[in-house]
Curated annotation (Swiss-Prot):
UniProt cross-references to Pfam families, sorted A to Z: Urocanase (PF01175), Urocanase_C (PF17392), Urocanase_N (PF17391)
InterPro entries: Urocanase (IPR055351), Urocanase-like (IPR023637), Urocanase_C (IPR035401), Urocanase_central_sf (IPR038364), Urocanase_CS (IPR023636), Urocanase_N (IPR035400), Urocanase_Rossmann-like (IPR035085), Urocanase_sf (IPR036190)
UniProt-recorded name of the protein: Urocanate hydratase
Gene Ontology CC entries for this record: cytoplasm
Gene name of the record: hutU
Recorded metabolic or biological pathway in which this protein acts: Amino-acid degradation; L-histidine degradation into L-glutamate; N-formimidoyl-L-glutamate from L-histidine: step 2/3
Originating organism: Chromobacterium violaceum (strain ATCC 12472 / DSM 30191 / JCM 1249 / CCUG 213 / NBRC 12614 / NCIMB 9131 / NCTC 9757 / MK)
């Protein structure tokens, strides 16, 4: 039987320039961004519609993809397209300030919210796994998580090494769409890194895009490269071909302790995201369609081996953190009772930023011209002049990050800055400084847009880790505020049953109406994050809410 999700003839690239294919820039933005998600420079397996994160897709199948594009081309300025798990299911009359697209991906009634039920529906063609930015059409390649990873490693250096990471190294696993950001983020923060990856093509892709410096095929070779870099006073990243469980356990056996240990394999998806020990990549992929239960059992057993190694390395002095792929949960289910003894990265390092609504703000130049991004970089510096850490990030990003697909930038800013940046970008479009409109979005990993007890909302002060009202309110408010497209997903990052989250995208097309929408959406969206954390009792969030004039009725 032919797989409707695989088409080797597809080679997708988003349109560039300032000529419209659709009836307005609002629909043109969605039209270009879904295609950009599937650009070979951007996506992990574009001919299978897979963008990143195991099986995170942009559309349910190729028929649905084609119909989405066809519908966007004819969509009027007062109509809204509804997309259900990657399938365009309806167009309804709304109004000009309503979203042009509303997306719901991978959502299941809680009792049935597990991989087994999802996989049944997926096989029947009734669902699609949207991950976070795959199915919401705002993935920008590995840059999308570079700064968040950099900020985390920067915080690790400050907390554990007195702000001096030089000569120290990080051990991790996974060089996929998300994990591929780790090597560059590490060297930007001053650490060396060994990143274990079982798929050699992924290592080669990260070499090509300059996210990793070197490739090694043995642990000895990788260790030698890191040691040479230490002696020369430089930071280096190494993609090591191998199985993460094997390598982590081997380091324990040898008595070698890295300075920092983490993991970004796609452990959230035990069928498609984690190679079991003793299996070849070819065997693993061959069995994915026919032996899901066998793979799951073998993968979780191997995850337990890796997590036990991480716990041992933690006991030996390594700063050890979970990077949000749910590997601790998988190991716990496999009998590793103390799997959660090492913390997740959000409560350990990132939550103070979330309390101020600071998170992964990103924008894309629909013109396709990198100069538009460089001009917006400069505008950010002008509007936020007293933040040397942010300026340093922008300088490093310009120098070291290769654009994938349409030129884009990510920049962690919060409640006090997002709206004015968006409106400034809109003014640049209006006065012709930029060659075409800018589209602004963010990861679903943000301060007010996700409920994920093993990641973003782990160890909330008031115990509200699993309360998922917050991302629902976020999506509703962004819809009411006039975002260009809004998405509501389940299972991103940590897998089925473990998260709910929402996404938002808004277009700067240079119009006065856009400026008003930007002012609403880019204040409200991070404002819900400050609200959520203030409600949970975080003083930083309470103070931020007061300083920024948020109206929170229960705030004392």
């Amino acid at each position: 039987m032919t797989d409707p999700r695989f088409d080797p003839s597809r080679h997708i690239r988003a349109p560039r320039g300032n000529q419209l294919t659709c009836k307005s820039w609002l629909t043109e933005a969605a039209y270009r961004m879904i295609q950009n998600n599937l650009d070979a420079e951007v996506a992990e397996h574009p001919q299978s519609l897979v963008v990143y994160g195991g099986i995170g897709r942009a559309a349910r199948n190729w028929e649905c993809y084609d119909k989405i594009l066809e519908t966007l081309r004819r969509l009027e300025d007062d109509e809204t397209l509804l997309v259900q798990s990657g399938k365009p299911v309806g167009v309804f009359k709304t109004h000009e300030n309503a979203p042009r697209v509303l997306i719901a991906n991978s959502n299941l009634v809680p009792h049935w919210a597990n991989w087994e039920h999802f996989n049944e529906l997926d096989k029947k063609g009734l669902m699609m796994y949207g991950q976070m930015t795959a199915g919401s059409w705002i993935y920008i390649g590995s840059q999308g998580i570079v700064q968040g990873t950099y900020e985390t490693f920067f915080a690790v250096a400050n907390q554990h090494f007195g702000g001096k990471p030089q000569g120290r190294w990080i051990l991790t696993g996974g060089l996929g769409g998300m994990g591929g950001a780790q090597p560059l983020a590490a060297t930007m923060a001053g650490f060396s890194m060994i990143a274990v990856e079982c798929d050699e093509t992924r290592i080669d892709f990260r070499l090509k895009t300059r996210y990793v410096d070197r490739k090694a095929t043995t642990l000895d070779e990788a260790l030698a490269i890191v040691e040479d870099a230490k002696q020369s006073g430089k930071a280096v990243s190494v993609g090591l071909l191998g199985n993460a469980a094997d390598v982590f356990a081997e380091l324990v056996a040898r008595g070698i302790t890295p300075d920092v240990v983490t993991d970004q394999t796609s452990a959230h998806d035990p069928v498609h995201g984690y190679l079991p020990q003793g299996w070849t990549v070819a065997q693993w992929r061959d069995k994915q369609k026919t032996a899901a239960a066998e793979i799951t059992a073998a993968a979780k057993k191997s995850m337990a081996v890796q997590v036990r190694a991480m716990l041992t390395l933690q006991q030996r002095g390594a700063a050890t953190l979970d990077y949000g792929n749910n590997i601790r949960q998988m190991a716990l289910e496999e009998g590793v009772e103390n799997a959660f003894d090492f913390p997740g990265f959000v409560p350990a390092y990132v939550r103070p930023l979330f309390c101020e609504g600071i998170g992964p703000f990103r924008w894309v130049a629909l013109s396709g011209d990198p100069e538009d991004i460089y001009k917006t970089d400069q505008k950010v510096k002008e509007l936020i002049p007293d933040d040397p850490h942010l300026h340093n990030w922008l300088d490093m990003a310009k120098e070291r990050i290769a654009f994938q697909g349409l030129p884009a930038r990510i920049c962690w800013v919060g409640l006090k800055d997002r709206a004015r940046l968006g409106q400034a970008f809109n003014e640049m479009v209006k006065n012709g400084e930029l060659k075409a409109p800018i589209v602004i979005g963010r990861d679903h990993l943000d301060s007010g847009s996700v409920a994920s007890p093993n990641r973003e909302t782990e160890s909330m002060r008031d115990g509200s880790d699993a309360v998922s009202d917050w991302p629902l309110l976020n999506a509703l408010l962004n819809t009411a505020g006039g975002a260009t497209w809004v998405s509501l997903h389940h299972g991103g990052g940590v897998g089925m049953g473990f998260s709910q989250h929402s996404g938002v995208v808004i277009v700067c097309d240079g119009t006065d109406a856009a400026s008003e929408r930007l002012g609403r959406v880019l204040r409200n969206d991070p404002g819900t994050g400050v609200m959520r954390h203030a409600d949970a009792g975080y003083d930083i969030a309470v103070n931020c809410a007061r300083e920024q004039g948020l109206d929170l009725p229960m705030l004392k």
